[in-house]
């Protein structure tokens, strides 16, 4: 055995390749073994080095991994019909084994038999024991491990009898020791590169082969000091390994050296070495200003800015002659950086390979199985059924996608949920596409559909029967046909990576079903259990990843770094929390148990002590990282990372302690003191030109040079990029609307406009909202809560029936109320049983009705105010109050109550589910049209009677804070005060109104006859103005805005506050408020009244 070592600042691979070339010249076959995590990149690097930079192949040199070696030597065919279980199959077998135990046999683990996490830990423990050359008998004796021994012993017995699983590597090692391959190994050289420690399984292999090959070479990193200093060294793991091998074998230990060593990286390595040994020394290691060329530390504003700066530097170096493959980006948190990095690199047109395993969980086929499981488990919840159909895997091959949208609309609107409702015919005949939706429902969800045949009953079936039934579902439900169509479409469009993903997912399904068949073939299971087991295998599966191109930027976890990785290294997202990365032991064996095992086992039997191994690994990872670049290394930390303030890692602090100020660089999104640093490519400059412009405008310093520079860039982009020209032309009009054409106006409005009163209040809130909801009849799904229309109709109907009673009195009021409440409650039950929110709302309605009814009861008791009509309509067929129009605008509505004073004055009562009061300012701005319109209607319907006014009554059950009252007797008065009418009255009737109980009369809402007439005229003018704009085809996006309110916490002006249509209009308050909003509340009540009395309204 030869062990070649060198310091990590030097090129180990160069020395090992010299040996490889010597051996190839002797016609020996060279097996070059590298760690699994870097085998692809290492193979590419070695072949390029051997061919002096160009791609090539060397027949007698194989870059491989330990576990692949048996395939090169053992050519025997497997003569077994047994199934070999993969990770998914092993998890299934562990699940089956756990189900076979009784609770008293494994009390600690019995409840975890279906836990995916526990099953994964069992697989991990078994794999660790194999790698450590241990068996369950080596586990320390305690109650927990006794249960694990039972589980693993039963598992291994079942596995060895029924399945073709065994350790090929372990078997190969045993056969090596027996001399079976001695003849083949005579002309073989084995070179090992990149290892600082070996597992027990690998060390046993080394022991078995090292004397049988022509030459056995281990290359690693160390120095003379480490070989004598013991644990106080940065190479502690390597020194322990070398010492162990020297004690076991005759070892030729040699140091290899290189003349080309980067002094900056040597400084950093020396700093780490001294720090790891806690040495106090007079030696001062400084990073100077000129070292910036090779090493920098960034402190970036945030992740986005950090990645953008990497992208800009890559583009600039590419323009100077570098290749994309010369760059490697290492990330501290691969998952957190994945989406942002991909978006930014795409913007900067940087090809990259992100070495982060991508889960199959988002593939339509996996979503189909997730939805199938959820449907059965949750009894056909609406969203689960919709998700199943929207996966577009289970569907009729000729089904129009639009029908799925109709189906989703229907089931959401009518709250369809539960198997019974989906298997029965949909009955809401007013839905325009009911026939299409029912046809699809019958085919895909009806009682004879493939899905119902598969999920239809809860009987247990054997595993083989479930596999057979699923196969029928996949065929009859067109799942196979659709998957084939997806694959073919991707291939036709040259989207080969997507086609490969479709193929991988399908192969994973087949593999999972085969392993399920092998494990659960004769086991009886319910459908939920079958789908749960199947889904566990699919959800955790990952796509195989292969770079689509050689000239790409490699992006990967920083823990996968090795020395001399690439020319330019950017290690980003390194904070105190992840650099170095602290890992907790989450396995089934504690660190103490691992130590106990290692103290009692034989040679070539040991298990990793994770606390020790992680410390050594972290130390070597940091060491590898600072020596990973050949030309330039950047270590970077964002100030804000995952919404938390970032802190410098201790490693950063060590390097900055004696560093020139140029080493630490603050990275900002736009910094006007920089110019060329912000130039990446034209697309990225276009993306940030607005930000640069704002910085120039807001900058207090007058920096003409920078202004001239960016103006020049701006002009170049405008001239050279037609798309940018179009963007600029459209910027000022990004949400401008286009007037409707005359023929369109004729079709939608004709000569007359028919609309409700409330729709015009919507018009004055925002014209575009009116257009979408009233002209285009766009509807949003309504959840049944206390503010929904259904609840409002419920209240109205109860009180209409009560107040219509001719013999109603204070004495029989409660009895009549109860009777009608029960009747209406029964009629509305189908709405209030649709979901949990509706049921909760229903449970509160009676209390609200009874609380509000106390006011009505008081009204019934008085002779001063009598109800003439309830729910009287206008503008509808057979309306009690006739038609009402303003010019060519025909209005419709319904007045809740028409009440008459004893003096014959008429007025209006309007019921509301939320708090309302009459505000003159809102009437002036067109936001409150109802009251004045209702009063205008009754004035027209009853021309000979005077008007007293209009009042709101809110339906509510007023909560009371008992801590704020002294005696329980106060509650009745508090409730009475809270339940009051509120609105506007005319001065002539004010005195009489004041005398009626439960009416809150404000002096500011009392108007004389002249003011009242002016308000009516103003109200009619609102309709005329709106009608004129509609007939002219003018529709603006102009939500109302009150200057004193500005933008609220949710980022909205007042007109957008409750609007569900912002995704359509794209109004953004901070951008469009000044140009596209309508300002209200600009005049006080006194100014409005003065205007009404005098010169009329300003236009």
Swiss-Prot record:
Its cofactor is Mg(2+); [4Fe-4S] cluster. Keywords: 4Fe-4S, ATP-binding, DNA damage, DNA repair, DNA-binding, Exonuclease, Helicase, Hydrolase, Iron, Iron-sulfur, Metal-binding, Nuclease, Nucleotide-binding. Its EC number is 3.1.-.-. Binds 1 [4Fe-4S] cluster. InterPro entries: ADDB_N, DNA_helicase_suRexB, P-loop_NTPase, PDDEXK-like_dom_sf, PDDEXK_AddAB-type. One of its GO terms (biological process) is double-strand break repair via homologous recombination. Despite having helicase-like domains, this subunit does not have helicase activity. Heterodimer of AddA and RexB. The heterodimer acts as both an ATP-dependent DNA helicase and an ATP-dependent, dual-direction single-stranded exonuclease. Recognizes the chi site generating a DNA molecule suitable for the initiation of homologous recombination. This subunit has 5' -> 3' nuclease activity but not helicase activity. This is ATP-dependent helicase/deoxyribonuclease subunit B. The gene is rexB.
């Amino acid at each position: 055995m030869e062990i070649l070592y060198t310091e990590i600042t030097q090129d180990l691979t160069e020395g090992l390749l010299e040996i490889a070339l010597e051996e190839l010249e002797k016609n020996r076959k060279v097996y070059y073994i590298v760690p699994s995590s870097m085998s692809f990149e290492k193979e590419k690097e070695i072949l390029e080095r051997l061919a002096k930079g160009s791609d090539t192949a060397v027949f007698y040199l194989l870059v491989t991994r330990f576990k692949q070696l048996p395939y090169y030597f053992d050519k025997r065919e497997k003569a077994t019909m047994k199934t070999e279980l993969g990770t998914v199959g092993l998890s299934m077998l562990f699940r089956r084994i756990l189900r076979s135990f009784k609770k008293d046999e494994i009390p600690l683990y019995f409840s975890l038999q279906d836990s995916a996490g526990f099953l994964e830990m069992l697989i991990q423990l078994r794999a660790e024991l194999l790698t450590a050359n241990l068996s369950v008998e080596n586990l320390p004796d305690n109650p927990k491990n006794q249960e694990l021994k039972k589980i693993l012993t039963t598992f291994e017995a079942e596995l060895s009898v029924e399945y073709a699983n065994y350790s090929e590597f372990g078997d190969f090692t045993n056969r090596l020791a027996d001399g079976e391959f001695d003849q083949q190994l005579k002309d073989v050289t084995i070179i090992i590169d990149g290892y600082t420690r070996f597992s027990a399984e690998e060390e046993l292999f080394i022991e078995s082969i090292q004397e049988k090959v022509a030459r056995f070479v281990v290359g690693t990193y160390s120095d003379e000091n480490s070989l004598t200093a013991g644990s106080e060294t940065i190479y502690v793991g390597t020194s322990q390994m070398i010492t162990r091998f020297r004690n076991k074998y005759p070892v030729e230990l040699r140091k290899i050296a290189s003349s080309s060593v980067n002094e900056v990286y040597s400084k950093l390595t020396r700093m780490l070495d001294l720090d790891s040994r806690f040495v106090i020394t007079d030696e001062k290691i400084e990073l100077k200003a000129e070292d910036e060329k090779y090493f920098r530390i960034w402190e970036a504003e945030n992740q986005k800015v950090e990645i953008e700066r990497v992208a800009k530097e890559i583009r600039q170096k590419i323009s100077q002659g570098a290749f994309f493959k010369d760059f490697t980006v290492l990330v501290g948190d691969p998952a957190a950086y994945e989406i942002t990095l991909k978006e930014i690199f795409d913007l900067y047109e940087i090809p990259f390979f992100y070495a982060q395993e991508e889960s199959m969980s988002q593939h339509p086929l996996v979503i189909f199985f997730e939805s199938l499981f959820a449907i059965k488990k949750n009894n056909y919840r609406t969203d689960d059924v919709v998700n199943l159909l929207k996966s577009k895997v289970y569907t009729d091959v000729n089904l129009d996608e639009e029908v799925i949208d109709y189906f989703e609309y229907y089931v959401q609107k009518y709250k369809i949920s539960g198997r019974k409702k989906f298997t029965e015919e949909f009955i809401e005949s007013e839905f325009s596409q009911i026939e299409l939706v029912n046809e699809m429902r019958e085919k895909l969800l009806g009682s004879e559909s493939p899905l119902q045949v598969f999920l239809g009953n809860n009987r247990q079936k054997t595993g083989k029967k479930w596999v057979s039934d699923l196969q029928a579902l996949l065929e009859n439900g067109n799942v196979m046909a659709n998957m084939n169509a997806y694959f073919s479409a991707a291939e036709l469009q040259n989207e080969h990576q997507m086609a490969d993903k479709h193929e991988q997912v399908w192969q994973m399904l087949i593999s999972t079903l085969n392993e399920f068949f092998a494990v659960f073939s004769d086991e009886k299971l319910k459908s939920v259990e079958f789908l749960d087991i199947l889904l566990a295998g699919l959800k955790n599966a990952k796509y195989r990843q292969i770079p689509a191109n050689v000239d790409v930027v490699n992006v990967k976890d920083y823990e996968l770094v090795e020395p001399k990785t690439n020319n330019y290294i950017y290690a980003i997202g390194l904070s105190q929390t992840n650099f170095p990365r602290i890992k907790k032991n989450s396995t089934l064996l504690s660190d103490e148990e691992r130590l106990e095992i290692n103290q009692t086992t034989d040679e070539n039997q040991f298990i990793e002590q994770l606390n020790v191994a992680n410390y050594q690994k972290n130390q070597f990872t940091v060491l590898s990282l600072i020596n990973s670049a050949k030309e330039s290394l950047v270590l970077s930390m964002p100030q804000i990372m995952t919404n938390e303030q970032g802190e410098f890692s201790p490693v950063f602090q060590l390097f900055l302690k004696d560093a020139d100020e140029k080493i630490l660089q603050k990275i900002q999104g736009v910094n006007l003191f920089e110019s060329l640093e912000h130039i990446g490519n034209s697309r990225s400059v276009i993306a940030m030109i607005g930000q640069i412009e704002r910085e120039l405008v807001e900058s207090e310093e007058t920096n003409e040079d920078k202004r001239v520079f960016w103006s020049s860039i701006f002009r170049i982009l405008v001239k050279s990029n037609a798309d940018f020209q179009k963007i600029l032309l459209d910027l000022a009009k990004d949400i401008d609307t286009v007037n409707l054409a005359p023929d369109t106006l004729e079709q939608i409005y004709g000569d007359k406009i028919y609309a409700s009163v409330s729709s015009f209040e919507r018009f004055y809130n925002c014209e575009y909202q009116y257009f979408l909801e009233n002209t285009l009849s766009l509807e949003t799904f309504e959840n049944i809560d206390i503010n929904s229309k259904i609840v409002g109709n419920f209240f109205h109907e109860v009180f209409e029936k009560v107040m219509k009673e001719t013999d109603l009195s204070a004495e029989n009021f409660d009895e009549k109320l109860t009777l009608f409440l029960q009747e209406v409650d029964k009629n509305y039950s189908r709405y209030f049983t649709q979901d949990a929110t509706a049921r909760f709302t229903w449970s509160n309605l009676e209390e609200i009705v009874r609380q509000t009814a106390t006011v009505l009861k008081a009204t019934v008791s008085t002779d001063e105010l009598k109800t003439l009509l309830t729910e009287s309509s206008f503008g509808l067929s057979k309306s009690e109050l006739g038609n009402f129009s303003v010019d060519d605008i025909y209005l419709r509505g319904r007045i809740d109550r028409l009440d008459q004073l004893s003096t014959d004055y008429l007025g209006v009562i309007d019921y509301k589910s939320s708090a309302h009061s009459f505000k003159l300012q809102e009437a002036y701005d067109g936001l409150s049209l109802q009251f004045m319109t209702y009063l205008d209607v009754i004035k027209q319907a009853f021309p000979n009677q005077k008007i007293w006014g209009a009042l709101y009554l809110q339906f509510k059950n007023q909560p009371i804070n008992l801590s704020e009252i002294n005696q329980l007797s106060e509650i009745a008065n508090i409730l009475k005060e809270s339940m009051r009418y509120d609105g506007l009255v005319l001065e002539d009737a004010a005195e009489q109104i004041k005398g009626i109980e439960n009416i809150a009369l404000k002096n500011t809402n009392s108007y004389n006859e002249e003011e009242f007439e002016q308000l009516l005229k103003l109200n009619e003018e609102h309709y005329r103005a709106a009608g004129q704009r509609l007939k002219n085809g003018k529709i603006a996006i102009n939500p109302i805005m009150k200057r004193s309110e500005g933008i609220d916490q949710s980022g909205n002006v007042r007109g957008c506050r409750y609007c569900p249509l912002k995704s359509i209009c794209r109004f953004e308050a901070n951008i469009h408020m000044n140009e596209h909003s309508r300002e209200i509340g600009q005049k006080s009540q006194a100014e409005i009244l003065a205007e009404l009395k005098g010169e009329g309204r300003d236009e």
